[in-house]
């Protein structure tokens, strides 16, 4: 009996091997908006069928996108997200396990033992469409030829090349996103034009962005082709506030001295009009220097007057702010002071 059983097992293994030894020869996406989106179908032994979404994840979709010469993964649809396949189509693959670096789905670990999967569990894939006008996504952004990294001519990195941006596709909401992405303050001059000295050279990025102004970076905005024959005379120039930085100078430690704040790439002083203990507290807190000492700021002038710009005046804090940038003050650069009125702050040197 044992020899007969072994013979039957051998015949069965040959039959199974003849049916499933070959990996899928072709992959396609069906039912989506373009060739790089849809239900995943594979060809196996001349028959097209679907893939079960058991364990289907972003790594598997990445391989499908790569095999089809599509762009990056956008989504990993599961559960029959697209139109149902033809009634005669079978579910050919129960499970797919890719590490995400394979060039084709055939190089992944595939399970052909379909036992509990229906077309309601068909796997899908959504990749960037390289044939679409919408594939203008900037990889990075920078502001150049300005006084600091928060002011200048807008340039975006696209397909490994820096390009200027036409102001026809620019607005306040886009500027807000750029300022946030660069780690700068709020948007000031939002979409001015470059002058002859600050115009760029080389390619002009012909994309138009639609942002709400709340996005973390430009990649989260909607993009389309800009139908405009722009020249470098229309290069976009914008300015953000600098990151709110402050320091105490002239003292024996970083926790005592004349107060200076950074604006437009330059350090300047703060006028002591209306300055008091609450404002001292906020500065010490922001610098990690503990609590403020000497509650009569008007009486201490021991670190000498500053030079250059006086950036802030009439600063008013509640004392609860974590940074001086959240306190009320006059517009940057507006004041009625001299450097004899520069603010000085002395803190305890450590958090308590």
UniProtKB/Swiss-Prot annotation:
One of its GO terms (cellular component) is cell surface. Residues 1-21 form the signal peptide. Disulfide bonds join 36-70, 52-117, 65-127, 98-108, 166-230, 179-240, 211-221, 255-289, 271-337, 284-347, 317-327. N-glycosylated. N-glycan at Asn-99 possesses only alpha2,6-sialylated terminals, while Asn-229 possesses both alpha2,6-sialylated and non-sialylated terminals. N-glycosylation increases secretion. It comes from the Eukaryota. This is CD5 antigen-like. Residues 27-128, 141-241, 246-348 form the SRCR domain. GO terms for biological process: apoptotic process; immune system process; inflammatory response; positive regulation of complement-dependent cytotoxicity; regulation of complement activation. It holds the Pfam family SRCR. The keyword Transmembrane does not apply. SUPFAM superfamilies: SRCR-like. Gene3D superfamilies: SRCR-like domain (3.10.250.10). It is found in: Secreted; Cytoplasm. The lineage of its organism: Eukaryota, Metazoa, Chordata, Craniata, Vertebrata. Transmembrane segments: none annotated. Glycans are attached at residues 99, 229. Specifically expressed in tissue macrophages. Expressed in thymus, liver, spleen and lymph nodes. Present in Th17 cells; mainly present in non-pathogenic Th17 cells. Induction: Transcription is activated by nuclear receptor liver X /retinoid X (RXR/LXR).
